[in-house]
UniProtKB/Swiss-Prot annotation:
This is Glycerol-3-phosphate dehydrogenase [NAD(P)+]. It is an enzyme of class 1 (oxidoreductase). It catalyses: sn-glycerol 3-phosphate + NAD(+) = dihydroxyacetone phosphate + NADH + H(+); sn-glycerol 3-phosphate + NADP(+) = dihydroxyacetone phosphate + NADPH + H(+). Catalyzes the reduction of the glycolytic intermediate dihydroxyacetone phosphate (DHAP) to sn-glycerol 3-phosphate (G3P), the key precursor for phospholipid synthesis. The gene is gpsA. One of its GO terms (cellular component) is cytosol. The keyword Mitochondrion does not apply. The active site is at residue 195. Belongs to the NAD-dependent glycerol-3-phosphate dehydrogenase family. InterPro entries: 6-PGluconate_DH-like_C_sf (IPR008927), 6PGD_dom2 (IPR013328), G3P_DH_NAD-dep (IPR006168), G3P_DH_NAD-dep_C (IPR006109), G3P_DH_NAD-dep_N (IPR011128), NAD(P)-bd_dom_sf (IPR036291). GO terms for biological process: carbohydrate metabolic process; glycerol-3-phosphate biosynthetic process; glycerol-3-phosphate catabolic process; glycerol-3-phosphate metabolic process; glycerophospholipid biosynthetic process.
Length: 335
């Protein structure tokens, strides 16, 4: 029987993986957090906090640290992957020898496969087969606020309704962590990935001093781009008005806790991409997602002007000023 006391294993000890592990443990699920760096895991075990990524948030008693992947997966039926999108394929290769028939896979990674633009669900099914229940967690949740126990809400989409309801009942907490079920895995994955690209655009706009009107226009036209792409892939339009669509987009475009927004701000103020990423010091998912989103839009024949212009800036040397001119100079059209 699945209960809130059933263990969960989280793979990925960065800021977001740690925050989710803290949340699950605090909500009553014995949680095992695995990281690829044994020294980092040992440090967290000693200090009972992730000083590198989430300083001053003390771990609950039922949060266990693990550097042995096989052992970490042995503890739990439910395996939650929280690694950067560029490392997603690699972690699938690592876990494959340790998967058992009873395992169920969830990921909170927001992105598309590097160099192909494929949905992560497609990558999972190709590498691991279609026999496992799969789910994705996505929504407007900054790691620090989540770890601090501040009120948050998130979307859970799964390919198995029973699995979705069981996992929802385990991690949902009425004290401040609300989990909404959505059956549209495609839409939930796309919203989480491409909002990072639009957030870079919002940051660039603010960095150039264009103001709140321009930022709001980018958010609004950004959700239109995401929705068009989603429809071309069979997603439900309503998904993009929910937590994993508009909710995550607004959060990421408007708050400086977002690395993607901060990255864009630096670009708008004249820094190059390499220097901006070095200043942030952590993975900027939107940098990689921009190329993949552009490739995916090209394959699908979907017009995504904001995404295309950010791609031109990051990978083709176009200036922020020329990007702005291109977007503002587009022909008149209906909304």
């Amino acid at each position: 029987m699945i209960t809130s006391q059933t263990p969960i294993t989280v793979l990925g000890a960065g800021s977001y993986g740690t925050a989710l592990a803290i949340t699950f443990s605090r909500n009553g699920s014995p949680t095992h957090l695995w990281g690829h760096n044994p020294a980092h895991i040992a440090q967290m075990q000693t200090e009972r906090q992730n000083y590198r990524f989430l300083p001053d948030v003390i771990f609950p008693e039922d949060l266990h640290l693990e550097s042995n992947l096989a052992q970490a997966m042995e503890y739990s039926q439910d395996i939650l992957i929280v690694v950067p999108s560029h490392a997603f394929g690699e972690i699938l290769i690592k876990i494959k020898p340790h998967l058992k028939a009873h395992h169920r896979l969830i990921w909170a990674t927001k992105g598309l496969e590097r160099n192909t633009g494929r949905l992560l669900q497609t990558v999972v099914e190709e590498q691991l087969g279609t026999q496992y229940p799969l789910a994705v967690l996505s929504g407007p949740t900054f790691a620090k606020e989540l770890a601090q126990g501040l009120p948050s809400a998130i979307t859970l989409a799964a390919n198995n309704e029973q699995f979705a309801r069981e996992f929802q009942s385990r991690i949902h907490c009425s004290k401040g962590f609300r989990v909404y079920i959505n059956s549209d895995m495609t839409g939930v994955q796309l919203g989480g990935a491409i909002k990072n690209v639009i957030a870079i655009g919002a940051g660039i706009s603010d960095g150039m001093g264009f103001g709140a009107n321009a930022r709001t226009a980018l958010i609004t036209r950004g959700i239109a781009e995401i929705t068009r792409l989603g429809i071309s892939l069979g997603a439900n339009t309503n998904t993009f008005m929910g937590m994993s669509g508009l909710g995550d987009l607004v959060l990421t475009c408007t708050d400086n806790q977002s690395r993607n927004r901060r990255f864009g701000l630096m670009l708008g103020k004249g820094l190059d991409a390499q220097m901006a990423m070095e200043n942030i010091g952590q993975v900027v998912e939107g940098f990689y997602n921009t190329k993949e989103a552009y490739l995916l839009a090209q394959r699908q024949g979907v017009e995504m002007p904001i995404t295309e212009q950010i791609y031109q800036m990051l990978f083709c040397g176009k200036s922020a000023q020329d990007v702005a001119i291109s977007l503002l100079g587009r022909a008149c059209k209906g909304e």
